[in-house]
Amino acid sequence: MRILTTPSASIPLPAFFPDATYGAIRAGSFEDVDAAGLMGCEMNSYHLMTKPGAKLVKSLGGLHGFTGYRGAILTDSGGFQLYSLIHENPEYGEIRDKEIIFRPDLGREKLTYTPEKCIQVQFQYGSDIMMALDMCTHPDDPLEVQRRSVELTVKWGERCRAEFDKLTKKLDKKPLLFGIVQGGSDPGLRMECGRRLEEIGFDGYGFGGWPLDASGAFRLDILKMAADAMPDHKLKYAMGLGRPEEIAALVDIGYGLFDCVIPTREARHQRLYTWVPGMDNPKGVRRKDGKFYQFLYIMDDTHRREEGPVDPACDCAL
């Protein structure tokens, strides 16, 4: 079994990190995370920077002190959120060659977000795993946009690595730094990005980009392109994924770390996961349709009156 060693926890792989976007699990607690046997959480650099602010978080002992959570904390770079907002409305700012310019609330005040700033903010958070700044794209973006994304992702990765090395020079316990492989749906660009990031040297590598097509279908082929571009001796991180069936498919092609908002979102909308009968152990015979879990609609008239456990195969409190 592979182990991911961080300053706060040693984590058996594959592993899933629930999203605690603003430093909290929606409709749950970190005690719930521990009870579920999960050893880490993902938190959002950009959202925490806007509210409550990186300086305040640092003054309270970083994210571990601010949240009271003792497991591993992974923070993203904030690049995806800035890309999404600017892509939705260009008046929010622009992605320049050396930095991202962002104007919150379309006001006069502007945020200049550089690769160095990205790393400095994550050090203020005291993150166990930090992500380098990248330029995100959509699979349908034209080739010239994908090429620019790879070029900026590599250049920004170099600057993130240099800033990270400077800030960790005197540390005994060092956090981990992951690079992000971009390239859209072009295999050549994915391989180029992975090769150049490997030359810089990172502790792990994340999938960059959008994993769905225009109709919302899961693009496993793009995830495989990115996985093939990452060194096999390093951890491969499927950022923002996924559903149980996605995780199962992605483990098969080499990914070992996952995070996603979907499990907590499903629960808030009263949909719970339960095992398909016979699939709750490694010896279960896979069904022809590949399904190994099913939805239980907890507030349906049938289920709301049941006194038994949600799933007899699960030892959770429900």
Per-region residue spans from a language model:
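Non-catalytic, usually N-terminal nucleic-acid engagement modules in DNA/RNA processing proteins
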Residues: 1-170, 290, 300-303
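Glycine-rich phosphate/ribose-binding loops and adjacent secondary-structure elements
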Residues: 151-154, 163, 167, 174-311
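Local cysteine-cluster metal-coordination motifs and their immediate loop/turn environment
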Residues: 313-318
